[in-house]
Amino acid sequence: MLLLVGLGNPGKRYAETRHNVGFMIIDAVARGFFFPEFCSKHDALVSIGNIGTHRVMLMKPLLYMNRSGTSVLSCTSMHKIAPEHITVFHDDVELQPGTIRVKLGGGSGGHNGLRSIDSAIGKAYWRVRFGVGRAELCNLSDYVLSDFENIAQVTDLVNSVAANLQMLLDGNAAGFVSKVTSV
């Protein structure tokens, strides 16, 4: 089984913020591949379904960003999911808006959600970085917890990530990035 984790914060207040783009992607995947309704497990919302030939668990941790690793560890321990079968979708302020990068392993880049997951399961999992840019005159925390200016454009990119996800799961990361960013 593969585990796809979207990072974000629970609650309507954060629903369309930059920091919640991981949740947005997981929701788009669930809709696009007709996953069953999410249920509460592992201090997260989870749903299990199929993407092509892959059995997949979708996860949205509910412990807030800086404790996401607790949910991921609980799930991976129970279901015996190896780190290389985990893909985490998250915002990245170091990438320009509309930019997507895929990487196996690496550091947290100052992202508290990744830092939490790194300390819980190590660093050998896949990351899909979703560029949200950085506001020069704004506190970083305030910036990532603020709503996107153009949610329609973000929604198009999020839907493109979901629509092309099977390519990534089949091992074609370069093709996935190329297809998603051509939107």
UniProtKB/Swiss-Prot annotation:
It is an enzyme of class 3 (hydrolase). It comes from the Bacteria. InterPro entries: Pept_tRNA_hydro, Pept_tRNA_hydro_CS, Pept_tRNA_hydro_sf. TRNA binds at residues 14, 64, 66, 112. Keywords: Cytoplasm, Hydrolase, RNA-binding, tRNA-binding. The record marks 9 as: Discriminates between blocked and unblocked aminoacyl-tRNA. It is found in: Cytoplasm. Its main location: cytoplasm. The record marks 91 as: Stabilizes the basic form of H active site to accept a proton. GO terms for biological process: protein quality control for misfolded or incompletely synthesized proteins; rescue of stalled ribosome. This is Peptidyl-tRNA hydrolase. It comes from Anaplasma phagocytophilum (strain HZ).
